[in-house]
């Protein structure tokens, strides 16, 4: 018998996460490594688990993730987005809960480019009156 799997793709900053939910005991594996080995910060681990906690499905599914691009924060956000999208395939009734928490919305904030004549995106060189 083929095992049931649910897929979701999440994006944040320059990170892209391909998430697979498989019925299991709650393991989270990112790029073939345990979540605690991959993500250094406890706060970011909480970010990743947020959709599972809100829908009360934390111990019901194994989460298998392939993520690339960006840093830890962007990757954690992308994984969260992917898990939320995959949970919608599990049960469409989760939509209001996930939507209220803002987990289905792609966070469009990305780093603004540096402009010529300025020191950063908006920071101008120091101005001297005299």
From Swiss-Prot:
Entry's Gene Ontology BP terms: translation
PROSITE patterns: RIBOSOMAL_S9
Superkingdom field: Bacteria
Entry keyword set: Ribonucleoprotein, Ribosomal protein
InterPro entries documented for this protein: Ribosomal_Su5_D2-typ_SF (IPR020568), Ribosomal_uS9 (IPR000754), Ribosomal_uS9_bac/plastid (IPR023035), Ribosomal_uS9_CS (IPR020574), Ribsml_uS5_D2-typ_fold_subgr (IPR014721)
This protein's GO CC annotations: cytosolic small ribosomal subunit
Residue ranges of coiled coil: none
GO molecular function: RNA binding; structural constituent of ribosome
Pfam families: Ribosomal_S9
Family: Belongs to the universal ribosomal protein uS9 family.
Protein name: Small ribosomal subunit protein uS9
The organism of origin for this protein: Geobacillus sp. (strain WCH70)
